[in-house]
Amino acid sequence: QTPVIVMTDHALATSYFTVNKFDLSRVSIDRGDLFCTKDTSEAAGYRRHKVTSSGVSPRAFPLQCEGILVCTDSDEHDEAGHLTEDAETRVAMVRKRMRKCDGLKRDVLQPVRYGAEASDTLLIGWGSTMGALCEAVDIMVAQGTSVGALHLGQVWPFPVETVADAIRKARRVFVVENNATGQLA
């Protein structure tokens, strides 16, 4: 129940690749906490944006159960989804949304390491830089350079500990990017 933005770069966005067939038997769908009841009085009290310890509210789909009204708004809203400018409600809703980040951080995708685990030089990249990173490491290792690479498959939530640990072990760090503004660096 979180918006997803897929960040890519031009090379990946305009490329085609042949990949092995996905094993769909390994895919599971977790629909999360769903709200459904046959009791219409309970359904009338459904709160789409209920404040929870995880930040994730129980979901009900429109027309899923008799008597459930799914209400939401793009501006600040209360637990029932109605517009509000109440300061306490605003603070509670912001905190609720931020708690969702804790769950995301538990499932962070760890960077892929290429080359030596500990090296004098570390190359860091994301997106379409993976091929260039690996090629650079191979060339530099063949020339006798102590070098390794770290490729990030996601940049948020950022894998802080993994990247910081890799940087601490290196004497020199280069961030290799395929953009003009150094978005990662």
What are the residue ranges of the model-derived segments?
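Flexible, low-complexity linker and terminal segments
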Residues: 2-185
